[in-house]
Amino acid sequence: MSKLNMTPREIVAYLDEYIIGQKEAKKSIAIAFRNRYRRLQLEKSLQEEITPKNILMIGSTGVGKTEIARRIAKIMELPFVKVEASKYTEVGFVGRDVESMVRDLVNNSVLLVENEHKEKLKDKIEEAVIEKIAKKLLPPLPNGVSEEKKQEYANSLLKMQQRIAQGELDNREIEIEVRKKSIEIDSNVPPEILRVQENLIKVFHKEQDKVKKTLSVKEAKEALKAEISDTLLDGEAIKMEGLKRAESSGVIFIDEIDKIAVSSKEGSRQDPSKEGVQRDLLPIVEGSVVNTKYGSIKTEHILFIAAGAFHLSKPSDLIPELQGRFPLRVELENLTEEIMYMILTQTKTSIIKQYQALLKVEGVEIAFEDDAIKELAKLSYNANQKSEDIGARRLHTTIEKVLEDISFEAEDYSGQKVTITKELVQSKLEDLVADENLVKYIL
């Protein structure tokens, strides 16, 4: 199945493997992502006219808002970035400006394209690395040797390469030249400052500067892999493709958008810069040009998905212009006790499967009785009702509490099968959940 060519039905079927319920949210987002593919099949002139229908997801924390968008972007291999609206400040104030989310998207897009190109050249890179190490391990031939000696050397080199590829010489030490570690650049500063940073680095830190290091063959493989990748890859083409892909199929997920909404009830007491952040966000969502270190990017074809719990405010508390830029609205359901149980038993990589896999490393086989799983779901649901509702995240902490002693004393249980019963779950959690003063500690 072509990943970008997935139909809405296929997208929802994929999401069902990891996320229980939330049918309406899955359906809306599947259609929005499919429309990205449909648009790219049209004539260039018509493509420009069709802008994505941005989505506003409304639901409590832990119900699957981020996971739905992240999973689709991952399976379809689209540039994706998740940001939190509350982390941004109005232009003129100290803090991150909203344009940095677009720069983050472009960085992720370039990295995505680079990894794809590396995967295509994987065998070629591997061969070049092995050849370089083999030539280091095998002394070079002197000048003027006979053809027979040259053939013998070629055969020896081939055998050496085979041994390196099979890992036979991984522990042998060799001295190689590797590039000095590059200086990290802060990509969240404006492009003008980025260019100054890059120019200073070129002056004080020449790329060709190398240092000699003694490494094991295994370590040398990794060190040389990055260096040889850079020589084989077309950096400029990767940057251009990354920029283009971010522009045409990028996805920005803005979480906690309710935190920058100004409630009509408490408007005068709230941070006045919240509305300023909304107004700064507006041109980016509507469509504008943002300068990045890779070049300029137009934002009108980026898909924006905003999400928030809206406990203390309403979507209507956002400025009208911003509301209008998120025409599709989806309300996600709170998790019931039954859904909690299904999350533990029916998802492809459920929390239970994760803990079983982790403890199997120590030789401990963990089995959960069905009644124990139901009790976990029940107590997690009750904790959500009595304290702040954090959705499925509550399951992580309740299971962690139940398995805490077994995880700590894992070596004592090595080679054994441990069965988690309803009684064990109750003994670990019931007193904690029953006491409203203690329930807040089950995060």
Curated annotation (Swiss-Prot):
The keyword Nucleotide-binding applies. This is ATP-dependent protease ATPase subunit HslU. A double ring-shaped homohexamer of HslV is capped on each side by a ring-shaped HslU homohexamer. The assembly of the HslU/HslV complex is dependent on binding of ATP. The gene is hslU. Coiled coil: none annotated. GO terms for cellular component: HslUV protease complex. ATP binds at I20, G62, V63, G64, K65, T66, E67, D255, E321, R393. Keywords: ATP-binding, Chaperone, Cytoplasm, Nucleotide-binding. ATPase subunit of a proteasome-like degradation complex; this subunit has chaperone activity. The binding of ATP and its subsequent hydrolysis by HslU are essential for unfolding of protein substrates subsequently hydrolyzed by HslV. HslU recognizes the N-terminal part of its protein substrates and unfolds these before they are guided to HslV for hydrolysis.
